[in-house]
Amino acid sequence: MKVKVFDLNGQPVDEIELPRVFLTPFRPDLIRRAVIASWTHRIQPQGRDPMAGKRRVTENIGKGHGMARVERLKTPPRYAAFVPFARGGRRAHPPKVEKIIWEGINKKERRLAIMSAIAATANYDIVKSRGHIVDNVPQLPLIVVDDLQKVSKTRETREIFKKLGIWEDIERAKEKSGVRAGKGKMRGRRYKKAKGPLIVVGKNEGIVFGARNHPGVDVVVVDNLGVEHLAPGTHPGRLTVWTVSAIERLREIYG
């Protein structure tokens, strides 16, 4: 299937044959598994010192003293020690570094999940259901000439995004970003940031600097493209802009 290629003014200038990866069936179940597997691989194993709470000289005084028969310090004050319910005692069931905390996924399933997430970016219904504004987007997938990769100024990318019809979605991401409700504000996640358009390029020649200050916009080189870029929060159908070189590289990788 052939689709149009647009210049930086939003005008069609050429046509390109889409790679077969855009015909992959929609598999939200695999996409969700792949994203969760990617999340869990960022978790760091944690454990406790095996001797924590046990560095005490204690004794059990036995029965007949009118007090609980727990381990107590040998020297006054004879506080309870060592046991889990005592101050400074050991943990009853501490976390172990041996715990399996990573979710696994088969290689072929992960590859199929990425292919399915790529195909979902070309489906208007899936993209709209994710919350993106695509009323002025001329086509999906939106493919742009490679000159976009060289734009390094924020004001220039703003004008380009307006002409391509994706600026409304960036404004949506800006309006939805703000201070989080609840106690998460005190726990290192004060702000919520909405996801806007994704820019996939064949090579970074300055576009990262030009687009990084726009709220919700991410730029990724196609060789580093992962399922988390295409389906943030396990929700596929992200509004995506592709360059011609990125499409050709997709053809080499996925066919």
Swiss-Prot record:
GO cellular component, one term: ribonucleoprotein complex
Alphabetized InterPro entries for the sequence: Ribosomal_uL4 (IPR002136), Ribosomal_uL4_dom_sf (IPR023574), Ribosomal_uL4_euk/arc_CS (IPR013000), Ribosomal_uL4_euk/arch (IPR045240), Ribosomall_uL4-arc (IPR019970)
GO biological process: translation
Record bears the keyword RNA-binding: yes
Single GO term (MF): rRNA binding
Record's keyword terms, sorted: Ribonucleoprotein, Ribosomal protein, RNA-binding, rRNA-binding
Alphabetical list of Pfam families matching this protein: Ribosomal_L4
SUPFAM superfamilies per UniProt: Ribosomal protein L4
Keyword hit for Transcription regulation: no
Family, similarity comment: Belongs to the universal ribosomal protein uL4 family.
Record note on quaternary structure: Part of the 50S ribosomal subunit.
Entry function: One of the primary rRNA binding proteins, this protein initially binds near the 5'-end of the 23S rRNA. It is important during the early stages of 50S assembly. It makes multiple contacts with different domains of the 23S rRNA in the assembled 50S subunit and ribosome.
Protein name stated in the entry: Large ribosomal subunit protein uL4
Species annotation: Pyrococcus horikoshii (strain ATCC 700860 / DSM 12428 / JCM 9974 / NBRC 100139 / OT-3)
Name of encoding gene: rpl4
